[in-house]
Each structure stands twice: as C-alpha cells, then as structure tokens.
Amino acid sequence: MTVIANTGDDIWISGNLVCPDLDTVIYTTAGIVSERWWGINGDTFRTHERLASLGQKEALIIGELDRAIHIFRSDLLRRGATLTDATHTISASFQLSAKILPMTDDFVPTTIVTDKGEMHIQDFLVKYQQAPSVSQVRCRPGKMTKEVETALEECRSVVIGPSNPISSIGPILNVNGMRKILKDRFVIAVSPIILSEPISGPAGKFMESRGLPVSSLGVAEFYSDFLDALIVDHRDDISQSDLPDGIELFRADTIMYGIEQSKKLATEIVRILAHQS
C-alpha cells in the first residue's frame, strides 16, 4: 500500500518543518498516534511550554517526541535531502510496511482568504479556531515527484479517504498532472459529510467558498472529473440519481470511532475494489 499525503498544511515552527498530515499518517500507520489524531501518544510538552514562557508562542502544540521528528527532518532537508527522502528515512525508523509519500517536494502552503485577511491554514485552524468567514482557499500547485508518479502508474485503484475535500485532498489534486493521471485509474472516495454536516473540521466553510453544496453531492462534484465510485454513510439521504453520470454510489458506516470501525470500512472498500477488478 502507498499513501500520498497532503503537505499543504506544512509550516515552519521554531526553525523546524512541521508536516501535520504527513506525520499523522506515519504515526497512525506506526500505531503511535495520540487519541486526538495528531502527535504521538504519551508525549509531553515541556519544551513547548518553556518556549511560551520565554515569549515564543508556537502556532501548534508540539510534544517532545514529535519535535524530535521535526528536528531530524529539517536537518535532513538542510543537508540536501528532499522531503520524499526524509519521509522515507523517518518511515524506515518505524519499520512501516506501507510506503508513505509526500504529495510533492515543493513547499506549497495552503492559505485561507478570510474577513481577517489571508492566513496560513494552521493559523486559521488553531489561532483563529476556524471562526473567520472564508472567501477562498488557495492551494499552490506543486511539482509531482517521480515517486508519486511511479506509484500512480503502477496502481490500478486509488482510494480517497474521508478528509476535507478542499484543504486536505484539494492540495494533492492541485499537484501538476494529478487529476489527469487519476482519470485513467479506478478512483473511489469516502464522503466526509453526512446529510449537510461535515464529520469534523471546516469542510462546510471551505466547500461553500468554492460554490459547492455542503453535502456528499458537493464532494462528488468536486471529484467529478475522475471519480468512479463514492461511499456515503448509510444515514445520508443522497441517491444514485443525484450523482453525476459515471459515479456509482455505495453505502457504509463511515464514522470511524475506533480501530474496529476503521477495519470494517476498510473491508468494505476492499470488497468494492475486488468487485471492480
């Protein structure tokens, strides 16, 4: 299995590159992610607290074990490694069986245009607690790496998880050539919205800023140029006739409260993919 992770939320903090989505994928795959779904389970925050007492308030709350990864990654980058190289080295340290790839080696931070001005997505999420009204989500295009291109060329199917379509998946789709390659693959996505309610995060605000309905239909429309199948929660009221032509509708329990629910959803995805092969 290969996972292509969003790097649009990457941010330099206290001299180190923090890659929230990329690291969450690594920590989750390694079985050490915290119950908050970010950072490392059991981590401590004395360095973060000490920096704050010195007047250096960091944009994110970073634990000691998590910070060690950021320091190590940043040192590799300063010595000439690419983000892909650094990610491979970090993944190897956890002995991961899955291949984790950043969507690009370029630094392409996502910014949010709001009534408080344009800001990095982490400032919108953490500093402003998602409160400002949103008029635009800006995802800068990055260059596709050879590793990502090869992974996509060698696969038959692509699964898009139930992440925020605009700010988590959108930056990946904005990588040069990504949407074109996906048109030649079987692509299945899991909707992160039930009825008109996002499962978590500011997906609603971000979709509205793109003129999309806050619904599974809006998700399908955003992916419509390459999507073959959409999994929605069994409580959703969308029907097959609502979807754009060429997209098949499936239903499942899409809320992942824990590992058992996650496994059940993964099993359903594998079943659908097996039926398509």
Where are these regions (language model features)?
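Short internal beta-strands
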Residues: 2-6, 186-193, 229-234
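Electropositive, gly/pro-rich neighborhoods at or near active sites that engage anionic ligands
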Residues: 6-141
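Short gly/pro/ser/thr-enriched loop/turn and capping motifs at secondary-structure boundaries
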Residues: 8-13, 194-198, 256-258
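A short, well-structured juxtamembrane/interface segment
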Residues: 85, 140-154
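Active-site glycine- and acidic-residue-rich loops that bind
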Residues: 139-141, 164-175
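Short acidic, glycine-rich surface-loop motifs adjacent to enzyme active sites
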Residues: 155-166
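Redox- and metal-dependent alpha/beta enzyme cores, enriched for Fe-S-associated oxidoreductases
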Residues: 170-210
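C-terminal functional extensions of proteins
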Residues: 200-277
